[in-house]
């Protein structure tokens, strides 16, 4: 009987934790969302990630099955070394992630981000660039390719031109400039996002992830 009671209490606690965490993501403002992401990255970089696993994660999956309320949109590179959910130490349902090579934005990508803002009530967009981005490296080196890859490189070229002659590493300079440029374009090219940014309802930030340290830097 005692063992059975312990199991019931344990399951109840797991359900409570998962339900509470799902609710925490809903309706938080941009500044609080950004703080939560940066604190998560600090834990990740220090090897102290704390998001739920096993039973709590399973229960959270059930809780989120019918509705999602992500607290941030992350537009990041497709690079396998930069998974946003791990980098920000978040769990199921916390962030709405859109990934493309070099964070390149087209109509489909923009529509995906607009969906999160318009229909999911998300107030923060993070454009997440990263150290040693292969797409930016190819654009800087003037690489040519086949298929649709040249379209990706073409989209990054403005950042390459913008940073030519600057001191420092040309690839790193272009990576940072590309993220800043994309953040600006997201605001100016979307009739859904622009008025919300102007009113202060939505915030867009550019950020840079270091592969060497695991740390994220906000870009000015």
Regions found by a protein language model. Give the residues of each.
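Short glycine-enriched loops at secondary-structure junctions
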Residues: 76-81, 101-104, 130
């Amino acid at each position: 009987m005692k063992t059975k009671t312990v199991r019931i209490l344990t399951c109840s606690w797991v359900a409570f934790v998962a339900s509470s965490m799902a609710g925490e993501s809903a309706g938080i403002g941009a500044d609080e969302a950004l703080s939560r992401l940066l604190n998560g990255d600090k834990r990740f970089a220090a090897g102290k990630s704390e998001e739920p696993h096993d039973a709590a994660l399973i229960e959270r999956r059930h809780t989120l099955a019918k509705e999602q309320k992500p607290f941030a949109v992350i537009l990041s590179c497709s690079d396998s070394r930069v998974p946003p959910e791990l980098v920000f130490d978040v769990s199921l349902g916390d962030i709405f992630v859109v990934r493309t090579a070099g964070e390149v934005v087209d109509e489909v990508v923009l529509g995906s981000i607009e969906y999160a803002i318009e229909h999911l009530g998300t107030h923060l967009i993070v454009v997440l660039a990263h150290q040693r981005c292969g797409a930016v490296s190819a654009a800087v080196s003037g690489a040519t390719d086949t298929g649709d890859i040249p379209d990706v490189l073409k989209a990054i070229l403005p950042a390459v031109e913008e940073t030519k002659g600057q001191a420092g590493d040309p690839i790193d300079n272009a990576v940072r400039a590309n993220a800043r440029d994309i953040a600006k374009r997201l605001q100016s090219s979307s009739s859904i996002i622009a008025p919300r940014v102007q009113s202060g309802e939505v915030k867009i930030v550019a950020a840079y992830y270091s592969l060497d340290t695991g740390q994220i830097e906000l870009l000015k």
